[in-house]
Amino acid sequence: MSKLNPYFGEYGGMYVPQILMPALKQLETAFIEAQEDEAFQEEFTDLLKNYAGRPTALTLTRNLSPNPLAKIYLKREDLLHGGAHKTNQVLGQALLAKRMGKKEIIAETGAGQHGVATALACALLGLKCRVYMGAKDVERQSPNVFRMKLMGAEVIPVTSGSATLKDACNEAMRDWSGCYDKAHYLLGTAAGPHPYPTIVREFQRMIGAETKRQILEREGRLPDAVIACVGGGSNAIGMFADFIDEPEVALIGVEPAGKGIDTPMHGAPLHHGKTGIFFGMKAPLMQDSEGQVEESYSVSAGLDFPSVGPQHAHLAAIGRATYESATDDEALETFQLLARCEGIIPALESAHAIAYAVKLAKEATKETLLVVNLSGRGDKDIFTVADILEQQKVEQQKVEQQKADNQNTEKNNQESGNE
């Protein structure tokens, strides 16, 4: 049986404790066999179509583009059962777990979308489910926490480190190392040790394959660019995979610039990371001067990750894909803009990609076709955004009050001087 290549250029690999090597090799073998098994593929396709709701729509926005020369299409993964692209590959991995005879599923989650997708797949397929989630993310994603519990999952808050996604990943991996004989670690992004980046890409690649078919039907040609947000990078690699061999299509990933790409408050390892070993892989990693992992930051929990999938690192290194960034403020503005212009509330993660697409559309000087992966819906973010907007309103009122007070003081001083 052929084996998969564990590397993408210099990135990737299997940097895990020796105890986990048999589990990873078993997973690789099961995946290769499943790819060639007609019955497995039929069951996976049936679940995607009749349970998850594929294919998802490709929507031409009517009011979003600021430039008549540029059309912006949205690939509507927000319409998928579970609310995001995560459901695609979770169903694939859950079927693989059953194929390997596993009874339990371990997962990590940031925004909660992967946790929800894992919980629904486990409920459907009769698997026990436990999800590790950073304590900070538990607080800012309470609707998704309740959804997971409602579907029977055990949600375990992680308080170590920064209490965010990277810490949840570490705890999930630690748990798995003690019970891999009966449990499958259902990793949520196209990162981590081989064979996960390849498995996740293959179980997400229908995003780009559908997009290609749909845009050819609608426009008679391929898009000028496909755009997706990048944290670990699963939604982006799912969109990019079918376009990598189409050189006329630009592949654009959008990292979270947080408070500013040149501040310490961001989550952009492709911009400011150095190659390191993290989460079982060799990849760009946010590190301090002593090589320690730096804390990442983003307003969106799902992009709050200090590294990135190895295939994205390789695509950047060879110049096939470019990786831009969008700040918290740009994402928040676009979150509201899409809701007002199109009646669609995007996930904050997706809003980063849409923000960059709007910027690109504005600059177009010829007819331009842009497709953005709307990777998830924004229900989970409405309370977070409402709180931030309220804080901004209070701060603005304080500034205006201070300005008014200063003007009154100046006026009083002038009147006193005139006396």
From Swiss-Prot:
Transmembrane segments: none
Annotated SUPFAM superfamilies: Tryptophan synthase beta subunit-like PLP-dependent enzymes (SSF53686)
Family annotation (PROSITE patterns): TRP_SYNTHASE_BETA (PS00168)
Catalytic reaction annotation: (1S,2R)-1-C-(indol-3-yl)glycerol 3-phosphate + L-serine = D-glyceraldehyde 3-phosphate + L-tryptophan + H2O
Record-listed N6-(pyridoxal phosphate)lysine modification sites: K86
Keyword line: Amino-acid biosynthesis, Aromatic amino acid biosynthesis, Lyase, Pyridoxal phosphate, Tryptophan biosynthesis
Compositional bias per record (Basic and acidic residues), positions renumbered to this chain: 394-403
Gene3D superfamilies: 3.40.50.1100
Pathway: Amino-acid biosynthesis; L-tryptophan biosynthesis; L-tryptophan from chorismate: step 5/5
Biased composition (Polar residues): 404-419
Sequence segments annotated as region (Disordered): 394-419
MF (Gene Ontology): tryptophan synthase activity
Superkingdom, taxonomy of origin: Bacteria
EC number: 4.2.1.20
GO CC aspect terms: cytoplasm
Obligatory cofactor(s): pyridoxal 5'-phosphate
Family: Belongs to the TrpB family.
Subunit structure: Tetramer of two alpha and two beta chains.
Function: The beta subunit is responsible for the synthesis of L-tryptophan from indole and L-serine.
Protein name: Tryptophan synthase beta chain
